Swiss-Prot record:
The keyword Transmembrane helix applies. It comes from Mus musculus. One of its GO terms (cellular component) is plasma membrane. GO terms for biological process: G protein-coupled receptor signaling pathway; sensory perception of smell. This is Olfactory receptor 5G9. One of its GO terms (molecular function) is olfactory receptor activity. The gene is Or5g9. It comes from the Eukaryota. The keyword Translocase does not apply. Belongs to the G-protein coupled receptor 1 family.
Amino acid sequence: MADENYTRITEFIFIGLRYHPNLQVFLFLLFLLFYLVTMTGNLGMIILIRVDSRLHTPMYFFLSHLSFVDICFSSVVAPKMLTDFFADKKAISFLGCVLQQWFFGFFVAIECLLLASMAYDRYVAICNPLLYSVAMSQRLCIQLVIGPYAVGFFNTMTHTTAAFRLPFCGSNIINHFFCDMSPILSLICADIRINKLLVFIVAGAVLIVSSTTIIVSYFHILIAILRIRSAEGRRKAFSTCSSHVTAVSILYGTLFFIYVRPSAISSLDLNKVVSVFYTAVIPMLNPLIYSLRNKEVKSAMGRTVAKAKVFLKN
């Protein structure tokens, strides 16, 4: 429990992004565009998968959940970030900060583990195609989605509760544009070595377990593809995985850089710059990656547009 001699923090103030005043409107419009594309792209992907029966497969079942998580993940940070561009005081209440950090950690963990579930799905599809429909049963698919939500809940409950139960010093200035764990820990008066270790272990465990699942899956996938004799067969096999590999590489590269490297707590300004990429850009890129590089999605979009035109004519 916090010592009574410590100042009770009722709100936090964000330093936010550092930029030239002349860029204020431009950056606001840019991040607003990112958010709108994120919302429309991911919502469109969910609707497309829902209405097109040919996309009712395990792969697109996982993709629809990934799109849902991207919408939620982006909405945890973007609305507050956008309003702060024109706010004289970039403030957030203590409870608001707790909730923002809680949901942020929740959805980040889910996204990582969903990508691992999708990698396993690709492994079964390419390495055991004859058993695919049996192996990837509806029950297993549901379990591979519920699992990430359960782990995400445990992940965020663990380090968020451990951090916010500690006493904060008089300063309430957060060197970030949202309530991320690293700058929050820098404001705590108590010994935070256990908290740092907890973040490193819990966040690291999620990243390492999910990334190991992905690496092992793609190792077997690569071996299976190299055994395919025809160049056309290898090309088709690679094309089914290329979108997922691209999304994984972008997300995991930034997350490992911020949360797993030992100097993550001290490099707050650098973390803030990199955080822009994975909070604003990655949720926007995922639907673009999976639509522009996926023939099935593009075909489904064409069929849906054609049906819509017929419906409007009638």
